[in-house]
Design a protein with these regions (language model features):
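Ubiquitin-like/PB1-type beta-grasp interaction modules and other compact soluble beta-rich domains
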Residues: 1-82
Length: 83
């Protein structure tokens, strides 16, 4: 029986991050102790460095130390560059 309060979240990868990791959207369930952006990043990725990443929770830019709540959408995208 699934608990009433699930630690499920939607993870979205954009642009080159999606290309590098081979997917662009997943639903994950993680332990309450791992409900920070950095923990999710380490869970889904082992080869890309976090310094070149922008992260958002529910479409608001945040940082790797931000807390994630159940049912949040977490998106990882590369730093924007332009000329």
């Amino acid at each position: 029986m699934e608990s009433e309060k699930s630690n499920k979240m939607k993870v979205v990868l954009l642009s080159s991050i999606a290309e590098d990791l081979g997917w662009n959207e997943k639903f994950l369930t993680i332990e309450a102790s791992q409900m920070k952006v950095f923990s999710v990043w380490k869970l889904i990725n082992s080869k890309l460095h976090q310094d070149n990443i922008i992260v958002s929770i529910n479409q608001e830019i945040t940082d790797m130390d931000a807390k994630i709540n159940p049912n949040d959408e977490v998106a990882f995208m590369p730093i924007f560059t332009g000329g």
